Amino acid sequence: AACAAAGVEERVECEIAAVEPPRAEGSPFTLRLADGRFERAGAVIVAVGGAIARGLLPEGVPFREPEPTLGPLATEPRWPRRLDNIRVRGALELWRPDSRGMDGRALNDGGFPMGTHEGERLVSREVGEVMFRKYGVSGIAAFNLRRLVEPGDVLAVDFVPWVRLCDMEAFLNRRRKLLRASLGRDVTWSDMLRGMVLSPVADVLLEAAALDGAHLVAKGETVRMATFLKGLRLPVTGLGDVRQCQVHRGGVSVRAVDDRTCEVRRVPGLYVVGEALDVDAACGGFNLHWAWASGLLAGWSAAERIADLASLADASGSSGSERREGAP
């Protein structure tokens, strides 16, 4: 309604093939349409997805090839397939090899990487929803870590983020003691995990720790289970389902634009906003906020530019008329 009241002309099914900068100062931009026609404009705001922006922009504008981000992660072990579509409230940690690399990391008999972080450093930790998929992990925690992942990184799934690792063994021993008093008998591993995690998750944890759910909890086994409850490891192999990615990373370099107006420094009157700029953020509405905020900055500046150009044109026209009237 506001656009209609202001006399804004809207075009649909009108594909822009290229944006050509003015050939001289004060001249308009040329917008080449896909059907061969063209339009003129005093200012242009590019507000498209990063993958489309490159073909529109003039040569020489610094640009980083877009890649999907804020999406699920593909992982190496096969056990997430058994938990497909199961959600847990937990935490994901992203670990990266240090200068010593990843050589020497042991695997147990089931092929599960042992819960050690020797030779690695913690890159980031996200607490929130973790959703297992056939290819790996999804959910907000995985989406946010996707922005930071590099080849060779490893995820560690923390199923009990409310308990510190240093307190986990004591937590399990106390739980065993309380269950024994409540049940009136010795406690099995199935008893220990029931109510802590979902049954399919418990099966995976027991396999990872090489424990039998029907066997009684033995002294020393709580240390092993604590390790996997606090960090069941998943080597990252890449991006999961690309269709689930919410934004692209890449686009026009932020160094190429004025941070107050989003105007391209080398091409006055050309503005780049939203996903077309190399700006991305975590989940939580930040990317949408950036799209609206950058659009407002560019819109205000473009409107001022158009008004200034109109004033110059009027002044030039008035001067010309005065000269003609005063001519002999």
Walk through the language-model features, giving the residues of each.
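A glycine-rich dinucleotide-binding beta-alpha-beta segment and adjacent secondary-structure elements
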Residues: 203-280
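Short hydrophobic core segments
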Residues: 16, 38-51, 130-133, 295
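A conserved short coil-to-beta-strand element within the FAD-binding core of flavoproteins
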Residues: 12-27
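A conserved FAD-binding loop/helix module that cradles the flavin
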Residues: 48-52, 278-309
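Glycine-rich phosphate/pyrophosphate-binding beta-alpha loops
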Residues: 133, 137-140, 247, 277-289
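An anion/pyrophosphate-binding glycine-rich loop and adjacent beta-alpha core
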Residues: 64-65, 75-220
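Flavin (primarily FAD) binding-site architecture
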Residues: 46-59, 141
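Active-site-proximal substrate-binding core of FAD-dependent oxidoreductases
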Residues: 159, 165-176, 303-328
